[in-house]
């Protein structure tokens, strides 16, 4: 895992967009983002048990697996959104980027690769893309039945109770 400030330059979302300014993992924790590196899936099983993740599935995001809908899906994943539950991803192969909003409403880019696990809190604005190799395989973990319901950023979603709860846990973001 490597986290850094997104450079906001034009170009393909799958490029690095590396500003050259790294972000410390402790800063991610301040935003509510948790990161682990697990070479053994048994460690993932323990985390799942400890955090009451009852369900999981595996998704492969690639042109070979998704065919003609790949580009459309990657663009959809890159729309800024939040979820009403945690987003947990354990990278089994390939690499990709999660971008999360900072307290200054800037993007922090988090590069994940094999054996990285990330937990995004409910209510955090974020987006996802593969890297320029166009391939990632990830285990998705869920507390309840598997679902992926993005709520795209806008005034209505800003008023969402899960967003408000997130803002209460991260006061620096709420004061924007």
Curated annotation (Swiss-Prot):
Keyword Ribonucleoprotein recorded: no
Positions of Ni(2+) binding: 81, 83, 87, 126
Keywords from the UniProt entry: Amino-acid biosynthesis, Cytoplasm, Dioxygenase, Iron, Metal-binding, Methionine biosynthesis, Nickel, Nucleus, Oxidoreductase
Co-factor: note: Binds either 1 Fe or Ni cation per monomer. Iron-binding promotes an acireductone dioxygenase reaction producing 2-keto-4-methylthiobutyrate, while nickel-binding promotes an acireductone dioxygenase reaction producing 3-(methylsulfanyl)propanoate.
Major place of residence: cytoplasm
Summary of the function given for this chain in its UniProt record: Catalyzes 2 different reactions between oxygen and the acireductone 1,2-dihydroxy-3-keto-5-methylthiopentene (DHK-MTPene) depending upon the metal bound in the active site. Fe-containing acireductone dioxygenase (Fe-ARD) produces formate and 2-keto-4-methylthiobutyrate (KMTB), the alpha-ketoacid precursor of methionine in the methionine recycle pathway. Ni-containing acireductone dioxygenase (Ni-ARD) produces methylthiopropionate, carbon monoxide and formate, and does not lie on the methionine recycle pathway.
Name of the protein this chain belongs to: Acireductone dioxygenase
Gene designation per UniProt: adi1
């Amino acid at each position: 895992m490597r986290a850094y400030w997104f450079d906001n330059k034009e170009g393909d979302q799958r490029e690095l967009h590396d500003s050259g300014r790294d972000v410390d993992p402790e800063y991610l924790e301040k935003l509510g983002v948790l990161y682990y590196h697990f070479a053994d899936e048994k460690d993932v099983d323990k985390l799942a048990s400890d955090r009451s993740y009852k369900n999981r599935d595996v998704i492969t995001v690639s042109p070979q697996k998704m065919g003609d809908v790949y580009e459309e899906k990657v663009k959809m994943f890159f729309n800024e959104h939040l979820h009403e539950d945690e987003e947990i991803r354990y990278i089994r192969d390939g690499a990709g980027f999660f971008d999360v909003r900072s307290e200054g409403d800037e993007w922090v880019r988090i590069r994940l690769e094999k054996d990285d696990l990330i937990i995004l809190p409910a209510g955090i604005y974020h987006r996802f893309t593969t890297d320029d190799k166009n391939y990632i395989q990830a285990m998705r973990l869920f507390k309840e039945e598997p679902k992926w319901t993005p709520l795209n950023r806008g005034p209505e979603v800003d008023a969402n109770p899960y967003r408000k709860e997130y803002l209460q846990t991260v006061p620096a973001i709420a004061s924007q």
